[in-house]
Regions:
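Hydrophobic alpha-helical transmembrane segments
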Residues: 97-117
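Hydrophobic alpha-helical bundles in membrane proteins
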Residues: 106-109, 121-127
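A composition-biased, non-transmembrane "mature-region" signal
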Residues: 1-86, 123-165
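Hydrophobic, membrane-inserted alpha-helices
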Residues: 89-97
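Hydrophobic H-region at the start of alpha-helical membrane spans
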Residues: 84-90, 111-116
Length: 165
């Protein structure tokens, strides 16, 4: 007999996991529903493209991925460690730009400011994944993509990316 792995919580408008096995470390068990990682998924309902007006209407639902308290702590710790390092890296690049290139052509300075911003955001994503892998568990993205219910929704036309006009 097969049991349901998720249940709909109409009050919070989300699908909560009933499975207790952690998807991220494959060893732990989840104790509280709030330890789960809730992934927003989207389905485009209507798209309007007129010459001067664009509009997208979509549905959104959060699906819970079972996660133990240890994996939740690792994911939160990775985020807390990554952002200051990425910020320091971006500020270092900006200091380098201001010190060395501000006297030169303004286009070069603007391009290097964008490079610093990209390095900050990209560095944050890279470091978060690095710290998570170093702890020996799946990243949030890999855990979400490996969930069977998420896969079912993706095959039915839902997406992990929010639609934009």
């Amino acid at each position: 007999m097969e049991t349901a792995t998720h249940v709909l919580n109409e009050r919070l408008k989300r699908i909560e996991p009933t499975s207790k096995k952690c998807t991220f470390c494959l060893d732990g068990t989840t104790e509280k529903v709030n330890d789960a990682y809730f992934v927003p998924i989207f389905k485009e309902n209507d798209r309007t493209n007129i010459v001067v007006y664009r509009s997208v209407k979509y549905s959104k639902i959060n699906i819970g991925i079972p996660r133990c308290a240890g994996c939740r702590a690792i994911h939160e710790s990775a985020k807390k460690k990554a952002w200051p390092i990425a910020l320091v890296a971006a500020l270092s690049i900006l200091a380098f730009v201001v010190y060395n290139f501000l006297e030169f052509h303004p286009i070069v300075s603007v391009i290097l400011f964008f490079v610093a911003g990209i390095a900050g955001f990209g560095g944050y994503a890279y470091l978060t994944n690095y710290f998570t892998h170093k702890a020996g568990i799946h990243t949030l993205k890999v855990g979400a993509e490996s969930d069977a219910l998420i896969q079912d929704f993706l095959m039915k036309g839902w997406s992990l990316k929010q639609p934009s006009a």
